[in-house]
């Protein structure tokens, strides 16, 4: 179960619905992937986990390495570059390549978003569709838009038979 900003950290609403659903199916195992703002919320559950919840994984949207000094260099190979193009330019996205790239332990979101390859793909998008606005504004907007995506792709996502997203 993928829960954005709610279960098991907030009482009521969507969280209440998720908790009721999990309890209604005790014969099924559930793993929670909770997307939360930052590590300050980690483990502060408002619900007691039912026995059929085997794990809670957390993904943090404000967990970025921007401030760790000098940016590491990253150079994408051709397949990774095309996958990045596909997601930014709206082509048929090569999710397998993006997941593989982002799941590497040494992968740096900072290095990707501040790197040459990201810059060139954004520049291509800008020239094709958005050249009427200031490029620096566009570049930083694109970094802000894609940061949450790459944070989630960098998170260890548990294997499951079915993924259900609620928000």
Predicted regions and their residues:
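N-terminal subdomain of nucleotide-sugar transferases
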Residues: 1-114
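Short, flexible loop segments at the rims of nucleotide/cofactor-binding pockets, characterized by
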Residues: 8-10, 140-143, 162-163
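Long, low-complexity, polar/charged, intrinsically disordered or flexibly structured peripheral segments
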Residues: 91-156
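Short N-terminal targeting/anchoring amphipathic segment
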Residues: 88-91, 154-166
């Amino acid at each position: 179960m993928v829960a954005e900003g709610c279960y098991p950290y907030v009482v009521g609403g969507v969280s209440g619905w998720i908790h009721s659903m999990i309890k209604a199916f005790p014969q099924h195992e559930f793993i929670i992937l909770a997307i939360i703002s930052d590590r300050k919320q980690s483990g502060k559950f408002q619900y007691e986990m039912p026995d059929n919840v085997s794990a809670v994984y957390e993904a943090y949207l404000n967990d970025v390495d921007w401030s760790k000094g000098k940016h590491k260099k990253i150079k994408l190979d051709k397949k990774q570059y095309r996958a990045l193009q596909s997601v930014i330019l709206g082509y048929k996205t090569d999710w397998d390549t993006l997941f593989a790239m982002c799941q590497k332990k040494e992968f740096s979101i900072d290095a990707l978003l501040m790197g040459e390859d990201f810059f060139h793909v954004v520049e291509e998008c800008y020239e094709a569709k958005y050249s009427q606005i200031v490029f620096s504004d566009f570049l930083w907007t694109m970094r802000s838009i894609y940061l949450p995506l790459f944070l989630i792709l960098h998170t260890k996502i548990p294997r499951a038979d079915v993924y259900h997203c609620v928000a």
